[in-house]
Amino acid sequence: IDVDSEEFETKVDNYKNSLLIFEYQQRLIDQNFDTSVSTNDIINYYNTHIKEFKLEQDIFKGRLIIVDKDAPNLSELIKLFKSNDDSDIDEMISYCLLYAKEYYVNDSAWSYFNPVKSKIPNTMSARNIYYSNRKYDIVAQDNFIYLLFLKEYKFKGEISPFSIEKEKIKNLIINKNKMKYLQKLENVLIQNGRISNDINIYL
């Protein structure tokens, strides 16, 4: 291969300089860049760009219990499952710990529905359940009984709630702030004539 040695050395030097500058920037970021983002900043960003936050899949607040059809006291479990009383919910959780094959009972937090959908019979329709008066369905199939309650439900394409987007927005703001910081840093270094061999980095 015919390679111009001078051109090759120039490229190597440029590559080394790029690595040195990158390492220098990373160390300054580690030492000086503030990664904190206030909750107000996150809320303001969400409210300002709310139309951009569309759900890519269905989400829900609810409960799912999968239990063997031969599990004890199923009638009591169903009674507890339908209840919103705190003591009943605690009792339901205790039951699930002992007998449920799988369960999810945190109906105060949004969760993605796809993992649930993959575990329930095809006859259980989220749309039908959610728009029904009782908002739950109980289905026996094969060796198991499936109990599904949908307290709240949002479909793909709807506006995503703040709790789902909070961490994404925080990281987005951090990355934007980091880019601004790096641009400011680069401008200062250029002004000081320091983007050269003047920068001593001890690796």
What are these regions (language model features)?
Residues I1-L203:
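Peptidyl-prolyl cis-trans isomerase
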